[in-house]
Amino acid sequence: GTLEADLAVTNGVITALLDPPNDPADARGAHAAYLVDVTGLVVAPGFIDIHSHADFTLHGSPAAETVLSQGVTTLVGGNCGWSPFPHTGHGLLQRASSFMHPEVDWTAHDAGSFGRVLAADPPGVNVVLQVGHASLRLAVMGTTNRAPDATELAQLCALVEQAADEGVRGYTTGLTYAPCSYAALPEITAVAKVAAARGLTHATHMRDEGAGLLGAVDEALAIARRSGVRLQISHIKALGTA
């Protein structure tokens, strides 16, 4: 249920929950540095949007008014295998991600430099970064449709370690989208093992959400079991006719 009360906040921390006064001009309000009348509204913690692609637009719209107006105060980006890093600076990721209409400062090649660009014009929301497997593959292998060789797999893993060092909190796959769709179970498991060792989660847009849904769930679970990574299936649903 809900509770009707007055709420006191000091330095960003709730410090008192008080029965509402009969008189709106109660003396305790006079001692507040800032008084907000939210009579008839709901006070809630800021919402966390765990599935966002805002990392591709925050450089162009750092105030993030559209999400703040919905009560969202934390965005988790890098989902579905797509993150604005790492990239080689040759425009491949920029072109491949054009369907998201990115507003990205492409001078940032890795998670560290991307974060510094964000910090230079701080967004209006908290931002959690993840590194996407499609972006990793483009940086190492381009658009090639094959399994990585040993050197390339080592490079993929090294880039995940670098991203973890630079502050990302997750590793993601989008197995319906090329070039991430070219990655098979052994490749993803190897990279996910590195992610797990660095404490990252694995969020996946599975390989199939229609007739092959159950097989796609099995694949996601197999990756988690074999690698030890914590799994989050981004939008589990069934498409098609019942």
Regions of interest found by a model, annotated:
Residues 60-169:
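Divalent-metal coordination cores built from histidine and acidic residues
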Residues 1-46, 61:
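Histidine-rich, glycine-flanked metal-binding segment
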Residues 46-52, 75-77, 127-131, 171-173, ...:
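Hydrophobic faces of well-ordered beta-strands that scaffold small-molecule active sites
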Residues 36, 89-93, 98, 187-188, ...:
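Short low-complexity, flexible loop/linker segments enriched in glycine and/or proline
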Residues 12, 40, 51, 71, ...:
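Divalent metal-coordination and catalytic microenvironments
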Residues 53-56, 80-83, 208-210, 237-239:
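Acidic, glycine-rich active-site loops and adjacent beta-strand->loop/helix elements
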Residues 42-66:
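Di-metal (Zn2+ and/or Mg2+/Mn2+) metal-binding site signature of metallo-dependent hydrolases
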Residues 113, 119, 147-173, 179-242:
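Histidine/acidic residue-rich metal-binding segments in metalloenzymes
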